[in-house]
């Protein structure tokens, strides 16, 4: 196959530093599908790297300047440090170095682009849109920050002119896209390590909405104060269309959420029942957004509603890891207080009259410092909250910032060490209960071990 998409042919051979990451592998997968010569490396030998190798990419495990080979363009992941030997060699050679979002934007050229942004719910909503459109026969290209069982992959090159992508606001890179349809699920203060102030976060979303053309549309959640304010500000400018979705009476796409089995959307006088396989009000709202996108792209409303029934979830988004001793164990990527609250609310709806136990791993020292009391309030929705040490990710420790900032405010929880965590969870869980591992770090690895400890 030869590259025929404008913006890709000028890149030449592309080398990805950190190709195993879910976002980086998504872009690499699409480029390989379009015939772009791709190579890449990562510090660990991850399953996705073997998939990419089988598809034709040249893959190396470990970082070494020699891995660049004859690359003409470099794509570096956000987690790649400035002293990475491949990045150092690329800069010394004068090679262009692209952010992942810039590389993804190049693959979008010539498409009708749908981007999904928001502080929470991006991956799930993007996944819902992609599954819905595929089931409706539109076969979009897509790039998602999570693996999606109903799609089999986190990214693919489709046959239509539609491209669906998750737009990450964490470092401002969502401003590199040029959407026709932009979904904003919610807007809250987060990633203050990058933005500095909540006002700067809100301003970045204004800039994002301003990217829409006159014939485009902003789809904003009316149930969220930040997204609703963004919709109002954007509408007042008159530069693009604005539609809202949610449970509020004045939403353009009205959601009714009476709990499992009683979810529907109303549009233009018609009411369409949604058969959702994922629990929680947040997922009902995400489904309403996906429905709105599909209708904007010409899918008949009834067909759009029916297609949502094929969505079974995304990896690390309230994902069932197994059962043991009558206890169901789920895993969720939630790493902001609002997300933790939504995940635990979903767990409550699944548990019924039984108990909910959460093993939480805070993500980033800066986020823990900013939201410690909010995390505690959210975690107290559980009957038992066990909190691990902070997962640092890209950050260096901040003096005085530890998980005790959270546990000091908990009513039903305490700090646990990595060594005691599994036994502590197993000791409190009884038949019918729900266990939830929560966080954006390596807490996900505890799920299968907990299932095993429960005899599953």
UniProtKB/Swiss-Prot annotation:
Gene Ontology MF terms: ATP binding; UDP-N-acetylmuramate-L-alanine ligase activity
Known catalytic reactions: UDP-N-acetyl-alpha-D-muramate + L-alanine + ATP = UDP-N-acetyl-alpha-D-muramoyl-L-alanine + ADP + phosphate + H(+)
Name of the protein this chain belongs to: UDP-N-acetylmuramate--L-alanine ligase
Claim: Magnesium is one of the keywords in the record: no
Job description of the protein: Cell wall formation.
Enzyme class: ligase
Pfam families reported for this sequence: Mur_ligase, Mur_ligase_C, Mur_ligase_M
Subcellular location: Cytoplasm
EC number: 6.3.2.8
Associated pathway: Cell wall biogenesis; peptidoglycan biosynthesis
GO-annotated biological processes: cell division; cell wall organization; peptidoglycan biosynthetic process; regulation of cell shape
Binding site for ATP: 118-124
Family affiliation: Belongs to the MurCDEF family.
GO cellular component annotations of the record: cytoplasm
NCBIfam families recorded: murC
Keywords: ATP-binding, Cell cycle, Cell division, Cell shape, Cell wall biogenesis/degradation, Cytoplasm, Ligase, Nucleotide-binding, Peptidoglycan synthesis
